């Protein structure tokens, strides 16, 4: 797909992320795999002011094009693509319920079968590290080895998928799961969860289920 079209999709995803209540201000960032690297949102520009020319290309060596500053979180986007060869899009946000669970430093357990949308029986919480650091990117790479989404302790959420539409869909699903988890935690702790055997059944069914979008 041509660069300008991908850039437009990135901007549309950012705007939709805000519309869904998953993000606010200039927080969060979005990228797509492109050539030997990625296209990513810039730093410090509100989503509603973004144009295609603001979107930044970073090559596979981490070098960005001159005259543009990428999101400070570009390292963990790169780490996500390296950890997940099947991923072509990454969405990061500070969704309220996901961030609240991350502050508790808890993984989201199998409270609902939709947990399997992220690839397993839980959604992990990667350890805290300062934003934009190599240390944080290493935590993200490890957390995403066997999952399509992870919480970031005291920070937010990152979700990756085969395209932007599915990455945003997954991010929204995880936020709903986080809200359900916090609601249930207010009643009982530990919370009731589905068995590993049931999640294995759901994972198998999910091979032919989910958001259907033409690639």
From Swiss-Prot:
Known function: Involved in the degradation of L-fucose and D-arabinose. Catalyzes the reversible cleavage of L-fuculose 1-phosphate (Fuc1P) to yield dihydroxyacetone phosphate (DHAP) and L-lactaldehyde. Also able to catalyze the reversible cleavage of D-ribulose 1-phosphate, but FucA has a higher affinity for L-fuculose 1-phosphate and L-lactaldehyde than for D-ribulose 1-phosphate and glycolaldehyde, respectively.
Protein species of origin: Escherichia coli (strain K12)
Gene Ontology CC: one annotated term: cytosol
Disulfide pattern: none
SMART domains found in the cross-reference section: Aldolase_II (SM01007)
Pathway annotation: Carbohydrate degradation; L-fucose degradation; L-lactaldehyde and glycerone phosphate from L-fucose: step 3/3
Annotated EC: 4.1.2.17
Top-level taxon in the UniProt lineage: Bacteria
Gene3D superfamilies reported in the protein's UniProt record: Class II aldolase/adducin N-terminal domain (3.40.225.10)
GO molecular function: aldehyde-lyase activity; L-fuculose-phosphate aldolase activity; zinc ion binding
Outcome when changing residue 71 to Q: Loss of aldolase activity
More info: During catalysis the binding of dihydroxyacetone phosphate (DHAP) frees Glu-73 residue from its interaction with zinc ion. Then Glu-73 residue abstracts a proton from the C3 atom of dihydroxyacetone phosphate (DHAP) (or from the O4 atom of L-fuculose 1-phosphate (Fuc1P) in the backward reaction), and moves to transfer its proton to the aldehyde oxygen atom (or to the C3 atom of dihydroxyacetone phosphate (DHAP)).
Family affiliation: Belongs to the aldolase class II family. AraD/FucA subfamily.
Effect of residue 113 to F: Slowly inactivated. Has a preference for the D-aldehyde and shows an inversion of the diastereoselectivity. Loss of aldolase activity
Activity regulation text: Inhibited by phosphoglycolohydroxamate (PGH).
Identification of the protein by name: L-fuculose phosphate aldolase
UniProt site (Plays a key role in the stabilization of the transition state and positioning the aldehyde component): 113, 131, 209
Subunit structure: Homotetramer.
Catalysed conversion reaction: L-fuculose 1-phosphate = (S)-lactaldehyde + dihydroxyacetone phosphate
Induction: By L-fucose.
Result, substituting residue 26 to A: Decrease of the aldolase activity mostly due to a decrease of the affinity for L-fuculose 1-phosphate (Fuc1P)
Residues at the active site: 73 (proton donor/acceptor)
Residue stretches in coiled coil: none
């Amino acid at each position: 797909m041509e660069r300008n079209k991908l850039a437009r999709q990135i901007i549309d995803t950012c705007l939709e992320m805000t519309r869904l209540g998953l993000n606010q201000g200039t927080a969060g960032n979005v990228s797509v795999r492109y050539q030997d690297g990625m296209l990513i949102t810039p730093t410090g520009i509100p989503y509603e002011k973004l144009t295609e020319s603001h979107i930044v290309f970073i090559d596979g060596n981490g070098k960005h094009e001159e005259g543009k500053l990428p999101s400070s979180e570009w390292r963990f986007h790169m780490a996500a693509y390296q950890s997940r060869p099947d991923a072509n899009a990454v969405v990061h946000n500070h969704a309220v319920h996901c961030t609240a669970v991350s502050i508790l430093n808890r993984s989201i357990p199998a409270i609902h079968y939709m947990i399997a949308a992220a690839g397993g029986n839980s959604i992990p919480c990667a350890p805290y590290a300062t934003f934009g650091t190599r240390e944080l990117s290493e935590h993200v790479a490890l957390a995403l080895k066997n999952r399509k989404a992870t919480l970031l302790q005291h920070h937010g959420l990152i979700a990756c998928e085969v395209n932007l539409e599915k990455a945003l869909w997954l991010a929204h699903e995880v936020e709903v799961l986080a809200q359900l988890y916090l609601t249930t935690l207010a009643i009982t702790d530990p919370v009731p969860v589905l068995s590993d055997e049931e999640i294995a059944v759901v994972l198998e069914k999910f091979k032919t289920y989910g958001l259907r979008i033409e690639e």
